[in-house]
UniProtKB/Swiss-Prot annotation:
Keywords: Aminoacyl-tRNA synthetase, ATP-binding, Cytoplasm, Ligase, Magnesium, Metal-binding, Nucleotide-binding, Protein biosynthesis. The gene is pheS. One of its GO terms (molecular function) is magnesium ion binding. Disulfide bonds: none annotated. InterPro entries: aa-tRNA-synth_II, aa-tRNA-synth_II/BPL/LPL, Phe-tRNA-synth_IIc_asu, Phe-tRNA_ligase_II_N, Phe_tRNA_ligase_alpha1_bac, Phenylalanyl-tRNA_Synthase, tRNA-bd_arm. It comes from Dictyoglomus turgidum (strain DSM 6724 / Z-1310). It holds the Pfam family Phe_tRNA-synt_N. CDD domains: PheRS_alpha_core. This is Phenylalanine--tRNA ligase alpha subunit. It comes from the Bacteria. GO terms for biological process: phenylalanyl-tRNA aminoacylation. Tetramer of two alpha and two beta subunits. The keyword Zinc does not apply. Binds 2 magnesium ions per tetramer. It is found in: Cytoplasm.
Amino acid sequence: MNEEYIEKFKEAKEKILRAQNLTELEEVKRVYLGKQGFLTQILRSIGKMPQEERAKWGRLANEWKEELESLYENKEKELKYLTLQKKLEEEKIDITLPGRRKILGRIHPINQVIEEIVMVFKEMGFQVVYGPELETDYYNFTALNIPMDHPVRESHDSFYIDKEHLLRTQTSPVQIRVMENKKPPLRVVAPGKCYRRDIPDATHSPMFHQIEGLVVDTDVTFAELKGVLTIFAHRLFGKDRKVYFIPSYFPFTEPSAEMYVECGVCKGAGCKACGYSGVLEILGCGMVHPQVFRIVGIDPEKYTGFAFGMGPDRIAMQIYGIDDIRLFYENDVRFLKQF
């Protein structure tokens, strides 16, 4: 029996040291150090041994147990380390490889055009200003010399919040606010959103963008207006695009004109984008009406100026060759990701 226990001890040591993985090691522990292991058997059999051998085998069993547990712990640490190293090697990441490319958002094509237009005017010395989208009737109509009985004041043309407030129908109110708060000389552009009760079609939208421009100084002439806007058109569309100024009427300018450019979609042949006319109106303009100057407290005998308002939505149609303005507002990613 004594020889058998000694062989079992040697066998346990050898199997612990030869274990190839944690599963094998755990099995060795169960067989030799578990409840049914040989050390437990020794401790249980001590009571049956002769009196003189009990102390010897009790001490020896405890020494073997401590030695085997120490071997087990060291082997367990070794195998855990090797297992971790193997896992790290198998899951190794090559940090020199390029990462997965993220899909980034893009600036909306209309905002791109607005930025481009504003940059052209900034290079000509204009300052960028902004105004509220919720306006009073006074700034949106009265201060711009628009008569009380003008159709544009009707609720079927404008989005009224109450009797005195509405969503602005144009960015022109910004020029009134600027002239009230700053003294000439003035040279500003005001981009922003506008709202009208338009039925959506190829060239109309109830929400659209506009860029207002204003120049006030002594001896400003209509020739300067034409010069500035022609330079702008050639910078934006190219010098080969024909530009036309046609007499028009606006309550806040006198004389007034509309500026047309040759349609970039059909090259003047006529299409849906230009109403089959071959040209497209891109802005209205004119010399600031003396009455508007009087309303804001500027002497019309001393100062003159010109104003203009353009729709970057329609200009974007020309630049990108789009024949339906609704495409810009339908949020179709397939369309928008092209820009």
